[in-house]
């Protein structure tokens, strides 16, 4: 996640440009709604509110500290900014609840939203709070929860998961070559004393990963910490649930944007957007079958990256991959709330 407290968010102007395609589209309502699904410190939301003075921005975040900071930062916009604490795949519940509270116009149910941004992964604000346990450079409790009220911590994973479960997490979520070896070391060391703080884990990783790999593969803790964070916060599950759910809220012409920082996230986004933007007409037919046309089209050619100039100013922009798409057909658009079977 790109938000840097006190600094310009990654690719801010490009995000405004992409979301603006939906806000300014001919199908946008007079009071368009933008969802900033990963609010952080509020930098992208602030850019949207400044750029589109007729729009309402809904900021979602599971981290109450982020919500408090963003609410203070964006108070000057009054009722044009509303926030809600949730995992980002809870967007439908959030929008419904905000409409019930009168903080969003009820017409959003019918018209949908004009754009959204999801800036995935851990925020710079969270990395800069060592007590949260996200950063391996500072000794801190092995927590890693984006929502401090969630039950699962990184320490619990290390102390209670089986060897096979730990190895799977490190391999799948961290692409760690030495996942099995690290898992064996964790199980062996936790029998002596449970894991509590990050420094001990970092020390174990230095001792376990061969020196040659440490010299060429970046910091030895990077992949393990990433994998633990993804497991603690169920990040990939949330993302997989999110994409079809948020897509149903887009009106024709509205634009959705995802910013990814890990290949796992980007692969999930890429696969989903390709499926959404592909016609259901069987290949080989000379015409598009009615009702089988693609609901969406891609608005970026592949994955866009930050410019060299921006990366030079902000190294955290280096890994970002941006993918955007827009609705071109009302075929799959849903009016919420969904009917529930009796």
UniProtKB/Swiss-Prot annotation:
S-adenosyl-L-methionine binds at residues 42-44, 61, 88, 119, 126. It catalyses: cytidine(1402) in 16S rRNA + S-adenosyl-L-methionine = N(4)-methylcytidine(1402) in 16S rRNA + S-adenosyl-L-homocysteine + H(+). It is found in: Cytoplasm. The keyword S-adenosyl-L-methionine applies. Its EC number is 2.1.1.199. GO terms for cellular component: cytoplasm. GO terms for biological process: rRNA base methylation. It holds the Pfam family Methyltransf_5. One of its GO terms (molecular function) is rRNA (cytosine-N4-)-methyltransferase activity. Gene3D superfamilies: Putative methyltransferase TM0872, insert domain, Vaccinia Virus protein VP39. Transmembrane segments: none annotated. Keywords: Cytoplasm, Methyltransferase, rRNA processing, S-adenosyl-L-methionine, Transferase. It comes from the Bacteria. Belongs to the methyltransferase superfamily. RsmH family. Specifically methylates the N4 position of cytidine in position 1402 (C1402) of 16S rRNA. This is Ribosomal RNA small subunit methyltransferase H. It comes from Corynebacterium jeikeium (strain K411). The gene is rsmH.
């Amino acid at each position: 996640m790109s938000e840097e407290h006190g600094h310009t968010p990654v690719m801010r102007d490009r995000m405004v440009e992409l979301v603006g395609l939906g806000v300014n589209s001919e199908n946008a309502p007079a009071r368009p709604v933008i969802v900033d699904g990963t609010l952080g410190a509020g930098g992208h939301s602030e850019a949207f509110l400044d750029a589109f003075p007729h729009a309402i921005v809904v900021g979602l975040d599971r981290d109450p500290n982020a919500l408090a900071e963003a609410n203070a930062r964006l108070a000057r916009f009054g009722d044009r900014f509303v926030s809600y604490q949730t995992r980002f795949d809870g967007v439908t519940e959030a929008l419904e609840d905000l409409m019930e509270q009168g903080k969003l116009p009820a017409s959003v149910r019918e018209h949908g939203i004009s754009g959204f941004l999801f800036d995935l992964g851990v925020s710079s604000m969270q990395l800069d709070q060592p007590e949260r346990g996200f950063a391996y450079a500072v000794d801190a409790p092995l927590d890693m929860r984006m929502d401090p009220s969630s039950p699962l911590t990184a320490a619990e994973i290390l102390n209670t998961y089986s060897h096979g479960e730990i190895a799977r997490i490190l391999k799948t979520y961290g692409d760690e070559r030495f996942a099995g070896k690290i898992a064996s070391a964790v199980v062996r060391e936790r029998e002596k004393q449970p894991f509590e703080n990050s420094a001990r884990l970092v020390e174990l990783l230095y001792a376990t990963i061969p020196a040659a790999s440490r010299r060429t593969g970046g910091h030895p803790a990077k992949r393990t910490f990433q994998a633990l964070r993804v497991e603690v916060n169920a990040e990939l599950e949330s993302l997989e649930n999110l994409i079809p759910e948020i897509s149903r809220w887009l009106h024709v012409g509205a634009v959705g944007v995802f910013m990814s920082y890990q290949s796992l996230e980007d692969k999930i986004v890429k696969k989903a957007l390709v499926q959404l933007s592909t016609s259901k007409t069987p290949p080989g037919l000379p015409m598009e079958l009615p009702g089988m046309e693609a609901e969406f089209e891609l608005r970026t050619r592949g994955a866009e990256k930050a410019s060299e100039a921006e990366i030079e100013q902000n190294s955290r922009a280096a890994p970002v991959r941006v993918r955007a798409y827009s609705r071109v057909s009302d075929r799959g658009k849903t009016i919420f709330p969904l009917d529930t079977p009796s």
